């Protein structure tokens, strides 16, 4: 479930962003953006020149210099506004999270058990290792692990999902988040963080951008922009002596205008906004990224490790067939399977009971009246079943039943082995049923592949992304499901060690790997992966190991995360292409205007037939400022994303943003020149 999206130009955010844009005019703020810092210096210099001209200290057109100076300041303000608006949108999203944080009191237990004496203390004084009791109606005061009890918890304040979730001690559902509310029962929680370090605190800090650092690609692009700026600065500086030697020295105001129009101010002014907006779009998808680096890495990912259950398949395996062993009637197998599943409350267990009822009209028997002993499933035995009327019936995995049969002096039939392989090849999971030491047959549990998932994997393949299915199933079952789903590869009988080894193998080949996880056993692999999306419903260890947290706890979200990352990289690349292409048109506007008096041959470059040198220069400067404003929506929303190959994507962007970057300034500068001329402003 995604959070409510803010309007792109929310009035309150726009007003606040305008105020912040003015505050950012101070040199300390401008220094962080070298390209815009040059524009800021140029604005200051031309302001001083226009004042000197107006007071008669310097000769020249004071009105023209003032107009150039004013539009240069507007350029800086627009760049500041773009960044402030992006930050403001993120802070508005963070404010909704701040509403969750409430100064409250907690019941700190003196002993780690329910019923122990408790002290009432402020929640912000709780330390790591403290034990607290929370009951129905209480707000959980800290992040922690449930060590006793079980309760229904409302996590909507964090996740946006209204349906309550169960949190209980033991297993992968013991992690709780501060700021969520207990709906029923009680929990004894051990705090896992100190004040200011909670998940909510980290979310707020990350969303507000307080911890935002430039990503490697952003740093590389900044270095390129600085290099271009230095080249244009040196080139512009050499033009004054050339013009002076020609007998008609160009004014400093014109040279500053030329420099500002030639350096890549468009992308320089929008670069920070693109980075902030990328993290904001992640939050819009209910994913919290720990840094811009994580979002950027998502765009570069070329291997996706996807859990089978819940991501590729629906995750609710259903009994589809009873396959009896040689000499056993199918009805006898169905009867034994139903008995063994009467106390099994899992979806698989209930589906076995229902299938037996549908196939052979075997009505579900009253559990209480059977006077039977039910044997629950355990990770060690990997079986469950029932002891009734001297009958010992079990169902479980092939290996577990084989060990059970051999331990009871029996023999595992070869025909059942063949039936197990047959079920596995069809992409189903085989469960074997045994009574005493006699194997009765196989139950086929069919997991349904999600609709449309094969097409999504085909799109990812077009983009050069390899998909790998991770499953605990045997190789035959895994191979069948992998073929049906259309993944490129699979890892069967996966263990935490196997997942970690696979990630390292791909990284050794120079690939970037993304994966999801929710359990403590996923933590090593999450820590190793380049993009690690931890489920919010998972353990604290998993969330700390990942560099993103999915508040919806939806493993399929990994594909969307990659799309958002790629969209951010595409936006940055597209606007850089557009910005650099812009310079060509501005060159044709300003160079003839500035130097035609000295070198008349340059009039041949005035292909736009602009009205006068002053109108040409002023039109280029105005366009240079306005284009930043027009591109703010694109920087915040991101460019249109389509799953294409790298070469096709490059061609598409060159046509749209390269050619567009050439044509738009020619049209824009000419229109502005006509308006200035018609209005008599030049």
UniProtKB/Swiss-Prot annotation:
Reactions catalysed according to its record: K(+)(out) + ATP + H2O = K(+)(in) + ADP + phosphate + H(+)
Keywords: ATP-binding, Cell inner membrane, Cell membrane, Ion transport, Magnesium, Membrane, Metal-binding, Nucleotide-binding, Phosphoprotein, Potassium, Potassium transport, Translocase, Transmembrane, Transmembrane helix, Transport
A molecular function GO annotation: magnesium ion binding
EC identifiers of the protein: 7.2.2.6
PROSITE patterns on file: ATPASE_E1_E2
Residues the entry annotates as binding Mg(2+): 518, 522
Membrane topology, record value: Multi-pass membrane protein
Keyword Methyltransferase in annotation: no
Positions annotated as active site in the UniProt record: 307
Stored InterPro entries: ATPase_P-typ_cyto_dom_N, ATPase_P-typ_P_site, ATPase_P-typ_TM_dom_sf, ATPase_P-typ_transduc_dom_A_sf, HAD-like_sf, HAD_sf, P-type_ATPase_bsu_IA, P_typ_ATPase
Residues holding ATP: 344, 348, 377-384, 395
GO cellular component term of the entry, any: plasma membrane
Residues annotated as transmembrane: 34-54, 62-82, 219-239, 254-274, 588-608, 616-636, 656-676
Subcellular location: Cell inner membrane
Complex and partners: The system is composed of three essential subunits: KdpA, KdpB and KdpC.
Family stated for the protein in its record: Belongs to the cation transport ATPase (P-type) (TC 3.A.3) family. Type IA subfamily.
Function: Part of the high-affinity ATP-driven potassium transport (or Kdp) system, which catalyzes the hydrolysis of ATP coupled with the electrogenic transport of potassium into the cytoplasm. This subunit is responsible for energy coupling to the transport system and for the release of the potassium ions to the cytoplasm.
Protein name per the record: Potassium-transporting ATPase ATP-binding subunit
Organism, as annotated: Escherichia coli O127:H6 (strain E2348/69 / EPEC)
